[in-house]
């Protein structure tokens, strides 16, 4: 995996965590 791919995954995870928290 390239650094760009890793950064994208990290951003997606962060967005998912924030969304989740907002739903709660």
UniProtKB/Swiss-Prot annotation:
EC number: 3.5.1.14
Keyword set includes Membrane: no
Reaction(s) catalysed by this chain's protein: an N-acyl-L-amino acid + H2O = an L-alpha-amino acid + a carboxylate; an N-acetyl-L-cysteine-S-conjugate + H2O = an S-substituted L-cysteine + acetate
Top EC group: hydrolase
Cofactor field: Co(2+)
UniProt subunit comment: Homotetramer.
Single GO MF annotation: aminoacylase activity
Keywords recorded for this protein, A-Z: Cobalt, Hydrolase
Protein name, per record: N-acyl-L-amino acid amidohydrolase
UniProt keyword Protease present: no
């Amino acid at each position: 995996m390239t650094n760009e791919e890793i950064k994208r995954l990290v951003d997606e995870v962060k967005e998912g965590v924030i969304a989740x928290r907002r739903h709660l």
